[in-house]
Amino acid sequence: MLRRDSFTYEIQYTNAAEKFFRKHEDVREEYKAAIKELLAGDHPEKVDVKKISGKKSDYYRIRLGNYRVVYAVINGKIVVINTILAGPRGDVYKKMTGLK
């Protein structure tokens, strides 16, 4: 769990995301840095993030070079970033069709 000024946040990973990040630690570090940048609010425009439209409208994606990370934010006292998928662009969007 990480603290950021006045709130606490936690990044969680699904099994699929964890499997990807075990092979791509550099992308995991980029992702964590992007989340910190977004939450800090200093320069959120530096992070290429978009809300996903359609059935998965409560999901967001971060673009990290050729990779995409799909996540959802759960609010409360602790902000939980639930990392759903990570992988090459085409693979991530294909796998999203199987999400509930």
Range-by-range predicted roles:
Residues 1-35:
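Arg/Lys-rich, positively charged N-terminal/basic patches that mediate binding to nucleic acids
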Residues 1-4, 8-11, 64-67, 72-100:
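Enriched for short, Lys/Arg-rich terminal
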Residues 25, 29, 47, 58-60, ...:
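Short alpha-helical segments used as structural interaction elements across diverse proteins
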Residues 20-23, 50-51, 61-63, 72-74:
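Short histidine-centered beta-strand/loop micro-motifs
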Residues 16, 54-57, 88:
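Residues that form or immediately flank small-molecule/cofactor binding pockets and catalytic motifs
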Residues 15-19, 47, 81:
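Positions in alpha-helical segments
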Residues 37-61:
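A short, surface-exposed loop/turn module that caps and links secondary-structure elements
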Residues 23, 27, 37, 89, ...:
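A short linear boundary/processing microfeature
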